[in-house]
Amino acid sequence: MKCLKAAYIREEIQIPDKVKVSLENNVLKVKGPKGEVIKDFSYAKGIRIQLNEGKIILETTFADRRKKALLYSIIAHIKNMITGTINGYRYYLKVISTHFPISVKVSGDEVQVSNLIGEKNIRRAKILPGVKVTVKGEDIVVEGSDIYNVAQTAANIESSTKIVGYDRRIFSDGIYIYKKEVIGLEQSD
């Protein structure tokens, strides 16, 4: 059976008081107390984004399944942008070393990992713009206002310590993500 197209879909996202939003040529800028996030939605053909009286309005006509999926993905992106500029995002990584002590340091826009399973070379992971990385003993904290940059930086750090050619059950050395949270919404233990 064929999926019917929706003739008209309109979704609204309320803009909180703490946030300033501007839209120019489908480039959305969200600025809040924790920073600014800019995202280009020019790839979204057939979806109209506009600002009106404290709301972001998204509209589309004759939406099939793909266009609906794109619309609701854009809504999720915008909500993540708003949450990030109000609260921010934080990822926690743990340094695991069973054989050789791993040393981790932040140098400019990269994280340097040395002495991983006794290697002499330094492994490097790129820190994306707007992301702050701090090393506290065996914990690494990655935080920022753009969830995509924070997540990619944490993934860069984790994948830079991937060990190839050894049994992962025995050589479990590396850096691993163990917790993700929205700053300010963390659970009290």
From Swiss-Prot:
GO terms for molecular function: rRNA binding; structural constituent of ribosome. The keyword Membrane does not apply. Keywords: Ribonucleoprotein, Ribosomal protein, RNA-binding, rRNA-binding. GO terms for biological process: cytoplasmic translation. Gene3D superfamilies: Ribosomal protein L6, alpha-beta domain. Part of the 50S ribosomal subunit. Belongs to the universal ribosomal protein uL6 family. PANTHER family: 60S RIBOSOMAL PROTEIN L9, 60S/50S RIBOSOMAL PROTEIN L6/L9. This protein binds to the 23S rRNA, and is important in its secondary structure. It is located near the subunit interface in the base of the L7/L12 stalk, and near the tRNA binding site of the peptidyltransferase center. This is Large ribosomal subunit protein uL6. It comes from Sulfolobus acidocaldarius (strain ATCC 33909 / DSM 639 / JCM 8929 / NBRC 15157 / NCIMB 11770).
